[in-house]
Design a protein with these regions (language model features):
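Loop/helix-junction capping segments adjacent to catalytic residues or to phosphate/diphosphate-binding pockets
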Residues: 123-127, 193-194
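Short glycine-rich phosphate-binding loop at a beta-alpha junction
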Residues: 112-121
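Alpha-helical repeat scaffolds
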Residues: 16-24
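PRPP/pyrophosphate-binding module of the type I phosphoribosyltransferase fold
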Residues: 147-244
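Active-site-facing substrate-recognition patch
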Residues: 30-113, 151-180, 220-222
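The feature marks helicase ATPase cores and/or their adjacent C-terminal helical subdomains
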Residues: 2-3, 130, 238-242
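Short helix-capping/linker turns of helical repeat alpha-solenoids
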Residues: 1-4, 9-12, 27-30
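Substrate-recognition/cap helix-loop segment adjacent to the acidic, metal-dependent catalytic center
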Residues: 125-144
Length: 245
């Protein structure tokens, strides 16, 4: 029963994995639903990469899926490569120009717009992470840079390392008066719960900015229940039997 799943993990591409995973799930392998969902995340998420969707009234676009580190040994090669890009972006090693340019084109905001960037835990981290993409967006005509319209006033614990995300003090930044009346697009590396997005958008609107959308490098994939995966797999399995695949 374990053999199908073991072979599927060894396969790097989705096509090679698909049939093996279907048989493993049908045979009752308890690991197979996890592997199937990771391989086909778009089948279990209402939002899709590089497609416009709305989150609590905010038009959003993300370039790809981010998977937590605990799943790293289960990912396809292209997924692992994208996750590495997310880490490199966070560290300021890769501005991910292609990902953000595609996302901005999908968002399709017309007229004068300013990119504002999600405040980080320190000023150093904020500028290291966003200065490269801010310069690219402005030079490429996608959006004016609003990097200097946000000032990090004090260090705080990173939300990604805090045990309680809601317990992290986020009031560690100031917004310039120049934001008043500006149409802005929020730019960040990762969309997970969306709490930070909503709070930041609210604060921007309080100072008079007009939030026209948000662009993310990645969205954290949320694992569906195994029963949901099995229903989807049976649907595709029956379809494959009918088409002879």
């Amino acid at each position: 029963m374990l053999t199908f799943c073991q072979y599927a993990v060894a396969c790097c591409g989705r096509e090679e994995r698909e049939k093996l995973m279907r048989y493993a799930i049908i045979a009752g392998n308890r690991h197979a639903p996890l592997l199937y969902a990771l391989t086909y995340p778009e089948r279990f998420d209402k939002a899709r990469p590089l497609r416009l969707f709305e989150f609590r009234g905010i038009r959003c676009v993300f370039a790809g899926y981010y998977f937590p580190q605990r799943y790293e040994n289960w990912l396809c090669d292209d997924q692992s490569e994208f996750v590495r890009k997310v880490y490199d972006f966070k560290e300021g090693k890769d501005p991910c120009r292609n990902c953000f340019s595609q996302a901005f084109r999908v968002l399709s905001v017309t007229g004068d717009v300013t990119a504002v960037f999600m405040p980080c835990s320190t000023s150093r981290r904020y500028h290291r992470r966003f200065s490269g993409i801010a310069a690219f967006l402005e030079s490429g005509g996608y959006a004016r840079s609003g990097l200097d319209l946000i000032c990090i006033t004090e260090d705080r614990e990173s939300k990604h390392t805090s045990g309680r995300r809601s317990g992290v003090d986020t009031a560690n930044y100031m917004m310039a008066r120049g934001l008043r009346g500006k149409r802005v697009v929020i730019v960040d590396d990762l969309l997970t719960s969306g709490d930070s997005l909503l709070e930041y958008a609210h604060n921007l609107e309080r100072v008079g900015a007009i939030v026209t959308g948000a662009v993310f490098l990645a969205r954290t994939f949320r694992m569906p229940p195994p029963a949901t995966v099995r229903r989807v797999v049976w649907k595709h399995h029956l379809s494959a039997l009918l088409t002879g695949k």
